[in-house]
């Protein structure tokens, strides 16, 4: 028979310990935690009701100002968010002006609360821009930038810019801004016109003193879609951003572009400038790279076509895609002001299975470098039903080290050169023969390991709009790679011409697939 006195005493002691445990647990847990679920609730509620277009309260003087005047409006560094806190991250804000004429709400998330960051004109230096202080006292911010000592410990550098629609730009150590990422793209390149969703509200978590990453959230809104986003930013030699998103459709869309990247291509060795220019190339990116679910690597050099061009690449469960700047030598650009050799490449690394769909490349004609004319994104085969969440997770990499992005198992395209084809005559002169010629240099470890006498050959395919006049491969002693020469006779110059090529050694594929589109009227 049990000792009841012992049982009672033990029970009371256990209860006392249990009470202490519960008390400790309550004190150990945070009183609350902000998450993407909080933003998703707002996005879902917005999607269930009609779209309300944002209203602008920007005075006409600011809306109509020139870029040079807008540049004069600078944020006061000593007003930065967390200026006096022991964290390497600082937040500065953009003033409204020009086409940045819609205010976004920005909040700070702390361990205990969410507080809106209030606009004040005292935060800005207006330079020589004359303005009525009363007219701007309640304007609000156009966006924000994130500062971090990425290049040297005693200097804060801008590493992220959130400004305009759902655009954001990110750079790593030693990089300069080039291409942009976006939250969402809708109906890009459709005749009905593109819809540009915008981030209307942000929540930025206050980092701890030793945090090497920054977390922020965004609420996206547009006439036919809403979305909740979580970004975790890791500054470094290659800055990376983990993105988690939930998108809700208000209405049906023709095309949904996920993880979109936007860039610029004006001219380069594969499409020389139409007018004389001291720069050999002028672009933020020179190609689209795709790592397909089946392991194939594809490289599509970019063009500045005379007419809108849309290319699709059917890929199930992509392992990655991005717009890259493969040329990293200054002499390839010769631009001391804009330093295209330092522009970052952008790479999308999916998390989880994305299923069936395609990577789409949109190339838009442009006459100058101020227009972003290149867009790349993923489109799912099946769109979500209206009101149902579409969840997507991926990591964005911003890098100047393309070798880290590409697999060492395959050689890659170093450059694509295009010219009028010719034939060497008996007197050693070259006579044009009406063909279009391509020189494609492949480099990489699989080629370096080969003897220069190795029987490397090419596998090519060309569309119905051209005949192959020459297909040859030779060792390139300068790059320690191989150069493919193709000469094509285009049948109808008013039509585009597709071609693909890869190098092989017997039955072993040595390189990525070079996939080129010769635009119409070239």
Swiss-Prot record:
Signal peptide, first to last residue: 1-33
Q: Does the keyword Nucleotidyltransferase apply?
A: no
**Keywords carried by this UniProt record:** Periplasm, Signal
By its UniProt entry, which InterPro entries does this protein fall under? Answer: Gal_mutarotase_sf_dom, GH-type_carb-bd, Glucan_biosyn_MdoG/MdoD, Glucan_biosyn_MdoG_C, Ig-like_fold, Ig_E-set, MdoG_OpgG
Which cellular component terms (GO) are annotated to the entry? outer membrane-bounded periplasmic space
What pathway does the UniProt record associate with this protein?
Glycan metabolism; osmoregulated periplasmic glucan (OPG) biosynthesis
Q: What is its main location?
A: periplasm
One GO BP: beta-glucan biosynthetic process
Note the superkingdom of the native organism.
Answer: Bacteria
Describe its function: Involved in the biosynthesis of osmoregulated periplasmic glucans (OPGs).
Q: Which family does it belong to?
A: Belongs to the OpgD/OpgG family.
Q: What is this protein called?
A: Glucans biosynthesis protein G
- Say which species the protein is native to: Sodalis glossinidius (strain morsitans)
Organism phylogeny: Bacteria, Pseudomonadati, Pseudomonadota, Gammaproteobacteria, Enterobacterales
Q: Gene encoding it?
A: mdoG
């Amino acid at each position: 028979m049990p000792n009841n006195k012992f049982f009672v005493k033990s029970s009371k002691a256990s209860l006392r310990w249990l009470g202490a445990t519960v008390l400790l647990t309550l004190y150990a847990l945070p009183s609350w935690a902000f998450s993407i679920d909080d933003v998703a609730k707002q996005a879902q509620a917005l999607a269930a009701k009609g779209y309300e277009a944002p209203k602008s309260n920007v005075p006409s003087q600011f809306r109509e100002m020139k870029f040079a005047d807008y540049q004069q409006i600078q944020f006061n560094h000593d007003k930065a968010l967390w200026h006096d806190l022991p964290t390497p991250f600082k937040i500065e804000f953009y003033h409204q002006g020009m086409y940045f004429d819609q205010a976004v709400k920005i909040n700070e998330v702390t361990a205990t609360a969410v507080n809106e960051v209030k606009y004040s004109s005292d935060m800005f230096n207006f330079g020589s821009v004359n303005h009525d202080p009363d007219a701007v006292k309640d304007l609000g911010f156009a966006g924000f930038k994130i500062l971090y000592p990425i290049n040297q410990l005693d200097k804060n550098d801008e590493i992220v810019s959130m400004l305009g629609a759902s655009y954001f730009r990110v750079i790593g150590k030693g990089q300069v801004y080039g291409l942009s990422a976006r939250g969402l793209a809708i109906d890009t390149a459709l005749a009905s016109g593109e819809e540009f969703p915008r981030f209307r509200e942000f929540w930025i978590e206050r980092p701890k003193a030793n945090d090497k990453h920054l977390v922020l959230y965004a609420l996206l809104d547009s006439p036919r879609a809403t979305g909740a986003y979580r970004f975790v930013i890791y500054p470094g030699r290659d800055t990376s951003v983990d993105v988690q998103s939930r998108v809700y459709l208000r209405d049906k869309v023709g095309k949904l572009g996920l993880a979109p990247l936007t860039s610029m291509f004006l001219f380069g060795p594969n499409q020389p400038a139409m007018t004389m220019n001291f720069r050999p190339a002028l672009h933020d990116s020179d190609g689209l790279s795709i790592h397909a679910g089946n392991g194939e690597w594809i490289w599509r050099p970019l063009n500045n076509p005379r007419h809108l061009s849309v290319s699709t690449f059917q890929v199930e469960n992509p392992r990655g895609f991005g717009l890259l700047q493969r040329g990293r030598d200054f002499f390839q650009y010769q631009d001391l002001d804009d330093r295209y050799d330092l522009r970052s490449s952008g790479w999308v690394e999916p998390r989880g299975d994305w299923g069936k769909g395609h990577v789409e490349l949109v190339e838009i004609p442009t006459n100058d470098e101020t227009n972003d004319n290149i867009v790349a994104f993923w489109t799912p085969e099946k769109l979500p039903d209206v009101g149902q969440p579409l969840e997507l997770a991926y990591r964005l990499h911003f890098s100047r080290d393309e070798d880290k992005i590409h697999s060492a198992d395959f050689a890659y395209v170093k450059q694509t050169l295009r010219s009028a084809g010719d034939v060497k005559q008996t007197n050693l002169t070259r006579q044009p023969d009406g063909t279009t010629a391509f020189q494609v240099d492949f480099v990489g470890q699989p080629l370096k390991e080969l003897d220069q006498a190795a029987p490397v050959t090419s596998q090519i395919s060309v569309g119905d709009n051209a005949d192959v006049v020459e297909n040859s491969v030779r060792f390139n002693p300068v790059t320690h790679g191989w150069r493919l020469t193709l000469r094509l006779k285009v049948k109808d110059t008013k039509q585009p011409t597709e071609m693909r090529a890869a190098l092989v050694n017997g039955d072993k594929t040595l390189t990525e697939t070079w996939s080129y589109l010769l635009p119409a009227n070239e």
